[in-house]
Each structure stands twice: as C-alpha cells, then as structure tokens.
C-alpha cells in the first residue's frame, strides 16, 4: 500500500509495495499521468512477458509525487533472473538521453543494480535519495510476478 505524501509532496522514505491497480488508481489523477501509465503498463508487460522474467520494478521521479503533470517517470528493474536475450533491447539503450525508451514507453528505465554515473550508487539506492537535499525519500515497488497487467 502506498502511504500519503509528506509535506514536501513526496512519499515517506522506503520502498512502498503496490499492485498495478493501486499504482493506476493512486497516480493516474490527470490526463498526462494516464498517458504515462499507458506507456508504463506496456513496459511492465514487456519486462514480465516474452520470457524476460523480470520480477520487480521500482518507480521514481516526479511521477510518484504530487506533481500534476510530470514529464515522464523513472524506473529501475531488478536484473535477478532476467533473460537478457528475451529482453526488449530498448531497456539496454541508454544513448541520446534514453530517447528510444522515452519514445516507446514514455519513461526511463535502468537496471536496479547498475551504478548511476555521477553518484556511483546503484539505481535502487540512488532513486531513494532526493537529489537536491540528499534526504531519503520513498519510491514505489511492483512485484511483476503478481501483477495483473
């Protein structure tokens, strides 16, 4: 279950597990967010299906805040058990600011265990830190093995 936003408009620190239906209900409160959810749903299905076998995805960025019109969403996917040969190659294309990912799925995806360039922390940890303040913040976790997409 996803908790209420804090006074900064963010989720409290930690990974907040939710179902796909909860994510749609909680974060789909504007037409822009509905559009982003459409792309995210396609991406989640691609990570889960086609024998890729991804089991967990974590959602971050302004999408999991009170911002009414986020530009996109940021996500990282757990590499454990993933069949890279079955993975949509766009999930491994980080060129040109991840333009191909944004064009296809309206968001950006990173392997959760890959280090973020500037900080050196893996994306799963990097996503849980506010870039401006350095304080801990919350993200949303999805268990794709249980997700009904």
Regions found by a protein language model. Give the residues of each.
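Catalytic core of pol beta-like nucleotidyltransferases
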Residues: 1-60, 64-71, 79-149
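Aromatic/basic-lined ligand-recognition segments
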Residues: 76
């Amino acid at each position: 279950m996803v908790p209420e936003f804090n006074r900064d408009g963010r989720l409290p620190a930690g990974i907040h597990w939710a179902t796909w239906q909860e994510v749609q209900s909680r974060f789909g409160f504007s037409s822009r967010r509905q559009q982003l959810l459409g792309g995210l749903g396609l991406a989640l299905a691609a990570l889960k299906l086609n024998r890729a076998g991804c089991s967990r995805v974590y959602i971050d960025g302004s999408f999991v805040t009170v911002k009414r019109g986020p530009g996109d969403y940021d996500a990282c996917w757990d590499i454990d058990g993933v069949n890279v040969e079955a993975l949509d190659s766009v999930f491994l294309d980080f060129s040109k600011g991840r333009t191909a990912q944004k064009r296809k799925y309206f968001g950006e995806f990173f392997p959760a265990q890959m280090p973020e360039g500037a900080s050196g922390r893996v994306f799963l940890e990097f996503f849980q830190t506010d870039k401006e303040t350095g304080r801990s913040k919350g993200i949303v976790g999805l268990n794709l093995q249980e997700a009904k997409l």
